[in-house]
Amino acid sequence: MIVDNSKDFDLKSFLANLTTHSGVYRMLDKHGEIIYVGKAKNLKNRINSYFSKGAKDSKTLMMVEQIARIEITITPSDYEAYLLENNLIKQHRPKYNILFKDDKSYPYLVISRDKFPRVSFYRGKSAYKKGQCFGPYVSISSVKNTLNTIQKIFPIRQCENSYYKSRVRPCLQYQIKRCLAPCVGLVSQQQYDEQLAILKKFLAGKFSSVLEEISANMYQASEDMEYEKAQVYRDQLVVLRKLQQQQIVDIQEDKTFDVIGIYMQDSYASIALLQIQNGDVVADRHWSIDAKGQDKTSIMHAFLSHFYLGDEIRNIWPKNIILSKVEFADITDLMNSISQKIGQAINWIIAPAADNLKWLKLAEVNARQKLNIYTSSKSQYQKRLESLKEFLESEKDIKRIECFDISHFQGEATIASCVVYTDDGEDRKSHRRYNIKDIKSGDDYAAIHQAVSRRVSSGLEADNLPDVMIIDGGKGQIHQAEAVFREYGIQDKVQLVSLGKGVERISGKEKIYKGFDDTEYTLDEHNPGFLLLRQVRDSAHDHAIKGQRKKVSANRQSSIIEEIEGVGPKRRKALMMYFGGWQELSRASVDEIAKVKGISKKLAQEIWECFH
């Protein structure tokens, strides 16, 4: 249950009446924004400790000063408290929690849920929605190499469903024995499923088991005088044996573990995770964080909760987890919760012996190296922010920058892009695009006015206006933004600046205008603040171009269909609902198109001819 939903929050009364149950608490500021999420075995003791006279670090003191309200959720156990805490942190990303930012979106191999499944790869954790996932892999090249290896050993289809459904005869992959051609019924469901089951074992790292099973199948097929089938198994074994010889270490299936190394320097920390399977490093991942006021134990505690109690996709959970030295007593409850979530006991190794110590040292070296890179990059970016602040004569630190750019194709398909940079760097998840409507063809000024107006309107409502707004363009563009600022009365809330190439249009010689100031400024091309302006502007330009190209492509495909007599809005919608997009429709056969509700065979033929 949620306690305290009142608008008038009485802190003294709240603290006096707190429960001693376990649960999760949320600290909110005066704007109603969650600034910290925590969990506790005893909510009363934990929350009261923030307001006691005991020693506290500067970060905690700063947070306490901003608390305007506290909410709690009572949970039936510590396990549920850990899960809820983790989910709330991911959902709200409170500024006083330790936030882990994975270095990249990792690719996964996915076996689809089709009757005859395909194997493919997807980036990011949304991959699990596509089917059974294996991974993550450390890079696109590694996952593509694995796909290539799979195709040589296991004749499982890799084609898109639209291509698969349109086949009337086997493709080249069947001819070179890299697919069983389920598209035209050349393999039974049982035979296909047998190959699929072995593939899943292979992807799960059960190499020895795969070799044994294929070998047994080969001998059985030979005894049954199914010599062609036996030859297929033999060919699989040949490729697998070659693959086995390429491995650096012997296969040791009992050696499946994660190694977590941590390194701290000043107010920053880095975590390196090595995933070991069969005695070999199969993946390494890194997280770098701002860790002011935190120690190794609190960071490790937060990371274990973030990684193992989150939505991480793992097919093989480690039997052992090796950690950098931390205070074991402080994380025992969390360890039990992790074991409960993944459904198996874990051997936690805090002080590894010689055999495993080398892995921990390797993880810690990786963490240190990554932190050196992170702090160097962070330092350079902070210098650019400070230089821009100085140029703009700003009294407050720059926490959020937004930049607008306009793109169109011959005056049509106009898109406004808005990219976001924070004091941590580019925030890709916050980028967005605006479809510009009801303006004259090619009118960039009206497009800027509309996009900025929509952003300012929503920003005032959500109380998330940027500190600096950059407009890609010259005097004309910035004057349009100024008009919007006057309309909403935010001249003193957001600093406005534009960056244009001027008459010469030479990169590095851009003209700069500050909001409500007609003075033309120039900065040295190596000035850190100028480099930041160009960096953000170029990012906005790229984002706009990509969006505009997508819109042009969609408009062209849509206009092609609109020219066909008998295909109105309802049928266009039905086609999109069935195929999911114009690209998939363009690949479909006449018979496949005719399956769409309301589309006759004759009309399907006309639609097909539009794309061919």
UniProtKB/Swiss-Prot annotation:
Molecular function GO terms recorded: DNA binding; excinuclease ABC activity
Biological processes, Gene Ontology terms: nucleotide-excision repair; SOS response
KW DNA repair (keyword) present: yes
Domain UVR, residue spans: 208-243
Gene Ontology CC terms, in alphabetical order: cytoplasm; excinuclease repair complex
Protein family: Belongs to the UvrC family.
Record note on quaternary structure: Interacts with UvrB in an incision complex.
Function: The UvrABC repair system catalyzes the recognition and processing of DNA lesions. UvrC both incises the 5' and 3' sides of the lesion. The N-terminal half is responsible for the 3' incision and the C-terminal half is responsible for the 5' incision.
Official protein name in the record: UvrABC system protein C
Organism: Francisella tularensis subsp. holarctica (strain LVS)
